[in-house]
């Protein structure tokens, strides 16, 4: 039964590629037809441009799917943010990153659940762990791994100096 499930998963994956190819082929054929009609002055240049834009969009969508081919890319993920050195400034930056990733998840139809949150001393957060559930959440967010830096005039510094804040982000498949 388990082997059958694995085979069906592979078949569905291949079917997605075939459907994507057929969709792009249809759009390319429509573009060629639109261009032929344009040469005969039966359609406007704007209509050809519109057909071209649809082709490019579909091809780029396939290219992105090709970049997310690893098995774990299809999974949900755990995203952890830690504020770096810099006290309140970095804690505020970590909080901004948290809100940004939550909005990103929401806008892509992912479910976001905060499993651990430690507030900062004055503002922001020291650390947060979020579970982001949805198709390919890990694939889209894995490139966020690393240290994120923000340089700005600090609202917490009375002298109005520019401050550099750091926060680290770790993304792992769920």
Language-model segments: residues:
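Short amphipathic helix-turn modules centered on a small-residue break
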Residues: 1-3
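A conserved glycine-rich
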Residues: 6-174
């Amino acid at each position: 039964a388990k082997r059958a499930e694995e085979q069906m998963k592979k078949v569905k994956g291949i079917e997605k590629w075939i459907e994507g190819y057929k969709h792009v082929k249809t759009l390319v054929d429509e573009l060629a037809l639109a261009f032929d009609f344009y040469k005969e002055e039966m359609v406007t240049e704007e209509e050809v441009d519109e057909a071209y834009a649809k082709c490019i969009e579909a091809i780029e969508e396939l290219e992105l799917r090709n970049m997310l081919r690893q098995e774990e890319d299809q999974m949900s993920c755990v995203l952890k943010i830690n504020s770096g050195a810099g006290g309140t400034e970095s804690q505020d930056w970590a909080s901004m990153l948290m809100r940004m990733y939550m909005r990103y998840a929401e806008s892509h139809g992912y479910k976001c659940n905060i499993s651990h949150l430690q507030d900062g001393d004055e503002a922001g957060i020291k650390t947060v762990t979020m579970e982001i559930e949805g198709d390919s959440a890990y694939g889209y967010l894995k490139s966020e791994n690393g240290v994120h830096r923000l340089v700005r005039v600090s609202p917490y510094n009375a002298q109005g100096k520019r401050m550099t804040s750091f926060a680290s982000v770790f993304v792992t498949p769920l």
